[in-house]
Amino acid sequence: MVSKSIVALAACVAMCVAQPVEKMPVLKDQPAEVLFRESQATVLECVTENGDKDVKYSWQKDGKEFKWQEHNIAQRKDEGSLVFLKPEAKDEGQYRCFAESAAGVATSHIISFRRTYMVVPTTFKTVEKKPVEGSWLKLECSIPEGYPKPTIVWRKQLGEDESIADSILARRITQSPEGDLYFTSVEKEDVSESYKYVCAAKSPAIDGDVPLVGYTIKSLEKNTNQKNGELVPMYVSNDMIAKAGDVTMIYCMYGGVPMAYPNWFKDGKDVNGKPSDRITRHNRTSGKRLFIKETLLEDQGTFTCDVNNEVGKPQKHSVKLTVVSGPRFTKKPEKQVIAKQGQDFVIPCEVSALPAAPVSWTFNAKPISGSRVVASPSGLTIKGIQKSDKGYYGCQAHNEHGDAYAETLVIVA
């Protein structure tokens, strides 16, 4: 009797579990953000994976119906993809695509359409520096306004010839996240009559680098300081908030001779790591930067750098790292599944977020309702699923740090 019950239960589980089916209209994945340059044609893609013909597409912008025909926009044939012919600032917004077919109404996740730009300085100047030999030095470089935030690169360049330039890889020299260049000590090898240190900005808004400022070091002042070995804080990170999934860099830069190699600890535990580790001090900064390749929620805590060059007084600096997270799926449904009529059917959808992100469900692009559907932290249960329940089910979560959307097409057999 027990054996028969087990067999019957196994059969029920097999029938209730989602199974692959013949492909029907399912939207291709889209990027969460699309950047555009003003007046440069840009595409917001929306198309089914198989390029299905009998699909009617529509769009929303910032939560409202978007009539693209009233704008300088074209639509690709047999797709919902929009081609912004000459996009401008007013085209920025949060877009969403809908694809209606015999299977129901499929919905894309929200696509952020943003203008990329950078405010380019009108002048370039070269500043001559004459630092004290063996002292620490800061070469300033302000990051221009722009979106996304421009990237700063430093190079050692021969005069005005940008084609003759080298990357700066000296252990004593490290760039801060604000774009400034720091020398733990300036030495004779840094002096040159021909070369200069050039700070440049890079951005998706502009082709190539944009030089911002240059510095020459043609000579050094004689050092009369008898305490040259004392460690001096040049740049250290303050308490930080990091987003899960992002790269996080914590800085601990001290000047002094000889140069110190910071040791790193998290809540008292050594996190120096190896070059291949997710958390490591080995990233071409001689330990002055702790590199977290992918930030996790469990990285929250207090990071401390111990600095000692065996000459000056040892130094210590602590940074409190707080980790937040936009919604991230820990479990989500397949894009297309089949359910057996009459059985209870579960659509899995589990989300991790900090702070917590409420989950909402849609059916064919509308808020879901009905006494036979029950939402839980692990997913959506449809009791006694029927043919009329065929369609697209969307699981969406949102908090102040982002949003996530997953959708599945349920076919009832």
Swiss-Prot record:
Query: Which residues does UniProt assign to the signal peptide?
Result: 1-18
Q: Please cite one Gene Ontology biological process associated with this protein.
A: defense response to Gram-negative bacterium
Q: Which residues does the UniProt record annotate as the domain Ig-like C2-type? A: 25-112, 121-215, 233-322, 327-411
Q: What happens when the gene is disrupted?
A: Silencing by small interfering RNA (siRNA) leads to reduced protective effect conferred by non-pathogenic E.coli infection prior the subsequent infection by lethal and highly virulent pathogen Photorhabdus luminescens TT01. Speeds the rate at which insects die after the pathogen infection.
Top-rank taxon: Eukaryota
| Cytoplasm keyword on record | no
Please provide the record's keywords in A-Z order: Disulfide bond, Glycoprotein, Immunity, Immunoglobulin domain, Innate immunity, Repeat, Secreted, Signal
UniProt xrefs under Gene3D superfamilies: Immunoglobulins
Under Gene Ontology molecular function, one entry of this record is: axon guidance receptor activity
Q: Cellular component GO terms, alphabetically?
A: axon; extracellular space; neuronal cell body; plasma membrane
Give me the glycosylation sites of this protein: 283
- Kindly summarize what the UniProt induction comment says about this protein's expression: By bacterial infection.
UniProt keyword annotation of Isomerase present: no
Tissues expressing the protein: Hemolymph.
Q: Which InterPro entries match?
A: Cell_Adh-Cytoskel_Orgn, Ig-like_dom, Ig-like_dom_sf, Ig-like_fold, Ig_I-set, Ig_sub, Ig_sub2
Q: Which cysteines are joined by disulfide bonds?
A: 46-97, 141-199, 252-305, 349-395
Location(s), subcellular? Secreted
What is the recorded function of this protein according to its Swiss-Prot or TrEMBL entry?
Insect-immune protein with antimicrobial activity. Forms a protein complex at the bacterial surface. Can inhibit hemocyte aggregation.
Fetch the PANTHER family from UniProt: CONTACTIN 5 (PTHR45080), IG-LIKE DOMAIN-CONTAINING PROTEIN (PTHR45080:SF8)
Family note: Belongs to the hemolin family.
What protein is this chain from?
Hemolin
UniProt source species: Manduca sexta (Tobacco hawkmoth)
Organism lineage:
Eukaryota, Metazoa, Ecdysozoa, Arthropoda, Hexapoda
